[in-house]
Amino acid sequence: MSTLFQAVQDSFGLNVTPSHFYFPIPRLKSFNGKDWDACKPCGGLNFRIDDQVSRLHDDILPFAPEWNFPRNKNGDWHKFHFSNGYFECVDAEVAYSFVRRGKPRRIIEVGSGNSTLLLAAAARKNAEQGSPCDLISIEPHPAPFLQDGVPGLTQLIVGPVQKAPLELFRTLRANDILFIDSSHVVSIDSDVVYICLRVLPELAPGVLVHFHDIFAPLDYPEKFVRTNLCFWNEQYMLEAFLAFNSAFRILWASSAMQQFRPDVLREAFPAWDESFARMPSSLQPFVPSRDGKRVWPCSLWIARNFEFAERSLAPAA
């Protein structure tokens, strides 16, 4: 490819690639006839659905009285609200409750925005009850309200996570949280590659990890692919990482719960009802929904196992 042609592409924010099976961008016509609602096999992945239902009642619902988030923007940029188009019902309540329940000493967030407001609110509540939290956000393109400062946000690191030293993630301990909402793209030197191949193996036993926009056991939503041209692949790397992996276990998978136990979600999260339908129409093209009424929750929570860590750290014979 000539230098001039590459320069022209860069000036328009484009990258023209061949339509060929060696390239990661798929041919859209190859999806003709695909059943996007089909539940796909996930091999060695164990969603532990019964455990998730128990965790919902034991660790999440006790904090339901605190889920008093506004359903729409109310003018306060420092207060989390639903219908924001990024971090929505079910995922928000679960994240808030995990922070309140675990009382983490430190949260490292990779990819900041509306989730930062939610995490900061939970961290402030913990601090009021004597459990302060160090909330660090890593974001290459922070929104103005983050740069202005958010109560409860300890530090904002402006830059890609790939530049963050591994020593930072080694500071996380049991009940601490690594909260990830990345580019969702596996490519050379991408944030997803750095997180999955470099950061996750360094985490201490008991650290909780969150990934967003994980739709397993289904594929990415059709409109993400066909309309928004988002050819994400983070989910497939995570499925491969977790398959037959005794070092990590799934704590909560919103999409799997929607697939297998939607009745439980409807009863537990009242705000979920009509959460997509009441959203401003300008945001709906970017927000997934399976029925046109409710948002498609898509958080995945995993944890580093104590048992595996104890075995792996045992001295060699």
Enumerate the predicted regions with their spans.
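A short alpha-helical cap/connector motif
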Residues: 1-108, 114-210, 214-317
